[in-house]
Amino acid sequence: MNKCYAWVVRFALLCALSFVFLFPLWGQPSAPRATDRIVVTLSPQPLEGNQKVYFSISEGDQVSLESPSSGTLTLGEKKNRKQAVSLELPSGTTSFSLVGSLREFFIPYRAKGENTPKVAALDLQEAPRLLTLNCAGNDITSLDVSKNTSLTYLFCDANPIAELDLSRLPNLTSLSASDLKLKKLDLSANPKVAALGIGGNPFDQDFNLYAYSSLPLLQLTCDRLGLEEFDCSKFPKLEMLYIHGNKLKSMGDLRPLRSLLHLSIGDNPLRDFDENKLPHGRLRSLYCFGLGISSLDLSGFTYINKVDCSNNQLTHLSVNRCENLEVLRCGRNALTELDLTSLWLKELQCDRNQLSAILLSDRANMQKLSCYGNRLSLERMEQLVERLVKSSPEQSPRVFTPFTTRAEVPESNICPKSLVDKVRTAGWEVRVVTGVDAQGREITEDFEGSPMALEPTPQQSVFLYPNPAGEYILVENLSPNTWLCLYNASGECVQKELTGASGSLKLPLSHLPVGSYFLRADEGVFPFIIER
């Protein structure tokens, strides 16, 4: 009984003390939770109606639209620890503000097929807890990150930013600032930077890449800077080096870079490219495009996964012992045959060569194949299509590009519509290259909408020679006294001729540009090319 009484006394005393100390706080508002605020100014848009803006935050972050009040914020899918967010803003909106708990901000997080406005300015003064900022590909001219002292990752590529003050970011570990308007970049206050991208900036003549040699760099992107030399001993721990598009005349010996996994050295006027001086022990990807080399032997590169050796003068390419190779891009060379039967390829780009055969493994799980602008016969094309039909890739859609209608690219591949239908039935999308855009990227259209959908006659009773043709082409075994029509690759009839009583005809071609053509007669459709 005494013990019970003692506990009652203690409880009463505790309640009394709580009342004494907590009573002064009753009725007072609780301390506000820390809130981040980001103000976004949009570039002018010519579009009418409501505007849609997409961005992403970290999966655990919270965000709400502070203004304009008439806007709508919707949370989208979660992927790779990121939360997609979409905004619908009234027409004429020039800015909006977000509040919440924000550690990561990626804008614009563009949705496929959506025409979203770009960002003209970011006010980050009230977002001190921000750890990651990605604002690449916008119209930002000035970026103030002086209050974002916790920032560790900054990606601001492709903006017209002329100055970048990073002096208050001591924890910065990754900086991607390529294609800005920078004349100089001081990283003396950022000793932790391990990943650095500065390609395509108009740095002053006294720019010194080795000023960053004291940084613990693992990744370095310094492409298109006009560099005339590179001393790999200054950056011994590199795992990734992108140095393409410079003025390097000598590659030197890169074998000391024992940790190197990814190397891009293309589009340099190298005089001494030697694959034997590369650190082949661990290399996973190699980009050696546009070097003018005629031979490439990668037999010792056991772990390599991706190779881009396009736009060279290759007549010999050896990759058969690259057992981990999945992506091979060797277009715009002078190769006549590709034997890839030992590889488990997923993507092959071998367009604009002189290939008469492309041999793939039965085990290849092809997802993309571009082989236009070659000399594949009907028999070889049938073999190729059989391999594509049997492959069982992991992704869809699968894309097959066997043709081009570009006049400057001779097309001698023979792929009847029956073969196209066969590969389409197996789930492949068949494309035709029709041109290139201002950035040099290929423009394609669906096979069915192109003039290549004309059915070439696979077993020719009609003879055309020479093929490739030059100033003329001879056509034999035609029906007598019938009209022929000559089509260019765009599907336009550029010439009509009447056969004689013999069923033979000599067609003058000197007035026509080089490229791919089709001769249509009663007997069928016959492709040929003009070369000079």
Which positions does each model-derived feature cover?
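Bacterial N-terminal signal peptides
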Residues: 11-24
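Short coil/turn motif common to extracellular beta-sandwich-like domains
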Residues: 44-59, 466-474
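Short proline/glycine-enriched turn/loop motifs at strand-loop junctions of beta-rich domains
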Residues: 57-61, 99-101, 127, 148, ...
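LRR N-terminal entry segment and analogous cap-like coil->beta motifs
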Residues: 69-139, 301
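Concave beta-strand-loop units of leucine-rich repeat
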Residues: 107-118, 134-139, 150, 155-160, ...
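Canonical leucine-rich repeat
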Residues: 122, 143, 164, 185, ...
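Residue-level detector of functionally pivotal "anchor" positions at catalytic/ligand-binding pockets or at interdomain
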Residues: 436-465
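C-terminal outer-membrane/trafficking sorting elements
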Residues: 457-465, 469-532
